[in-house]
């Protein structure tokens, strides 16, 4: 019987000793099962019991592997997702972080659940990403992708920003606020949630726009079709510099008068879960929702 996966990548960053031990345990366990295993080269100086030829950079791991196991919290998953979404690589997470909305496996007993996944017992879903582009004088000055959200916000000094929002070139509204969160369904349980945005089911083809501390009593979050293109026109009268943050990890400088174009990326994150995965169980567990009464 053909195995669903043959080449497996282990991805993560050097953190505490427990997380490093999880990387080591995964490598030796998967190798003992006969898989070809490669590890994120950011761990090469620490995992000195792993042969040098088994380390690769993230792009090379995406090219080689048909399964990537991300060890850490959602932050590690976000960083890996922006790269792995370019490739035909399925991704699963071992939670060594805090909430872990995207990382399902328990690091203390991952073997049982992961073995079932390796045998083909898993749920697969595609999560879309956003592309964010900064346009200045008709040229794209910078761009990046975001799995959770792209956020327009002030630079180093906190102050209000004035901007206009267009959806498919149609004017929607203007705003004076601390910024705007443009979120995917995946990101709806992250920064967007903290800003009062709605929780969107991951399978929805939708994008939410969540104003940050708007200087008005009438502003509300807005959910639009996921195929819409969003343009933010930053007022030339703004003081100082602004930024667009992608997943809180990559910053794109914005100047007064710039245009910010945000749209759905053609790339997809192929996220997989154990067979018993339930999104609503995750919400109850992570957000402390009440259990069933009867």
From Swiss-Prot:
InterPro entries per the UniProt record, alphabetical: ATP-NAD_kinase_N, ATP-NAD_kinase_PpnK-typ_C, NAD/diacylglycerol_kinase_sf, NADK
Which GO MF terms does the UniProt record name?
Answer: ATP binding; metal ion binding; NAD binding; NAD+ kinase activity
Q: What is its EC number?
A: 2.7.1.23
Question: Per its UniProt record, what HAMAP family does this chain match?
Answer: NAD_kinase
What biological-process GO terms show up in the record? NAD metabolic process; NADP biosynthetic process
Report the catalytic activity: NAD(+) + ATP = ADP + NADP(+) + H(+)
- Kindly give the Pfam families that the UniProt entry links to this protein: NAD_kinase, NAD_kinase_C
Protein name, entry field: NAD kinase
Per UniProt, subcellular location reads as: Cytoplasm
Q: Where is the active site?
A: 74 (proton acceptor)
């Amino acid at each position: 019987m053909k195995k669903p996966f043959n080449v497996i990548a282990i991805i993560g960053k050097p953190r505490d000793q427990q997380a490093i031990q999880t990387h080591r345990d995964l490598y030796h366990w998967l190798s003992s099962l006969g898989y070809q295993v490669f590890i994120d080269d950011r761990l090469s100086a620490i995992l000195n019991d792993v042969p040098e030829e088994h380390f690769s950079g993230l792009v090379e791991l995406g090219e080689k592997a048909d399964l990537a196991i991300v060890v850490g919290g959602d932050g590690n998953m976000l960083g890996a997702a922006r790269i792995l979404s370019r490739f035909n690589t399925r991704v699963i997470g071992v939670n060594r972080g805090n909430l872990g909305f995207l990382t399902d496996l328990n690091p203390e007993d991952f073997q049982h659940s992961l073995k079932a996944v390796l045998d083909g017992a898993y749920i697969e879903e595609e999560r879309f990403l956003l592309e964010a582009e900064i346009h200045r004088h008709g040229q794209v000055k910078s761009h990046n992708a975001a799995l959770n959200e792209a956020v327009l916000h002030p630079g180093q000094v906190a102050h209000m920003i004035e901007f206009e929002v267009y959806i498919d070139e149609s004017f929607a509204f203007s705003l004076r606020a601390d910024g705007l969160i443009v979120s995917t369904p995946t990101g709806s349980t992250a920064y967007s949630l903290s800003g009062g945005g709605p929780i969107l089911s991951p399978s929805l083809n939708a994008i939410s726009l969540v104003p940050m501390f708007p200087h008005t009593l009438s502003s509300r979050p807005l959910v639009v079709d996921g195929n819409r293109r969003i343009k933010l026109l930053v007022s030339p009268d703004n003081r100082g510099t602004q930024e667009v943050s992608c997943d809180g990890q990559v910053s794109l400088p914005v100047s007064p008068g710039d245009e910010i174009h945000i749209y759905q990326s053609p790339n997809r994150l192929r996220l997989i879960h154990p067979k018993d995965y339930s999104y609503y169980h995750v919400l109850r567990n992570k957000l402390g929702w009440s259990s069933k009464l009867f």
